[in-house]
A protein has these predicted regions:
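Surface-exposed, interaction-prone regions used to assemble/regulate multi-protein complexes
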Residues: 52, 62, 69-70, 80-132
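Long, contiguous N-terminal structural blocks used for assembly/anchoring
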Residues: 1-95
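Acidic, proline/glycine-rich low-complexity IDRs
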Residues: 2-33, 102-161
């Protein structure tokens, strides 16, 4: 992997993922942030090590190159859950069913988050239903398989120690 380091800004250029900025993170979490053309929030790689080699770079590159497709798949998963399990979003059956019938499900501002191996998520930071405030709704995957949809309203921000 060809990496050029800018020591002052903690930015590396990764051959497959572009420029990655190492973010100061709490505790033993290491976070790299990258950009995705056309996707305002970009992506994060969150690891237990600062070594990017533990990330599945080829997998991440494939997801971010096809980010719009994956965003649409995640929105379709949300649409199904709104209709079948509105309680996941703390919504009534009627509100969930009505939201699921909208032409565009009102979830926006996707941020792609990758972990070790092929675990990843798309976190929709904003939505028109007031769900998941203030952290959003996370659609989680292992590889291409959906593993869960989570309302992040009960999440807590991790503070530096």
């Amino acid at each position: 992997v060809e990496e050029k380091r800018d020591r002052m800004a903690n930015i590396i250029h990764h051959a497959k993922l572009g420029d990655l900025c190492y973010m100061k993170s709490p505790q033993s979490i290491h976070c790299w942030h990258g950009t995705i053309t056309g996707c305002e929030q970009g992506f994060d790689i969150i690891l237990a090590s600062s070594n990017l080699d533990v990330a599945d770079v080829d997998f991440i590159a494939d997801i971010i190159q096809n980010w719009k497709y994956h965003e649409e798949k995640a929105l379709e998963h949300i649409r199904v859950k709104l209709a079948t399990q509105p309680e996941l979003f703390n919504l009534s059956k009627e509100t969930g069913k009505n939201a699921s019938k909208l032409k565009d499900v009102p979830f926006d501002c996707p941020q792609f988050v990758f972990y070790e191996k092929q675990e990843w998520a798309i976190v929709f930071l904003e939505n028109g239903l007031g769900v998941g405030e203030p952290f959003g709704v996370s659609v989680n995957f292992n590889g291409k398989a959906l593993t869960g949809i989570y309302d992040l309203s009960d999440a807590e921000e991790i503070e530096d120690e």
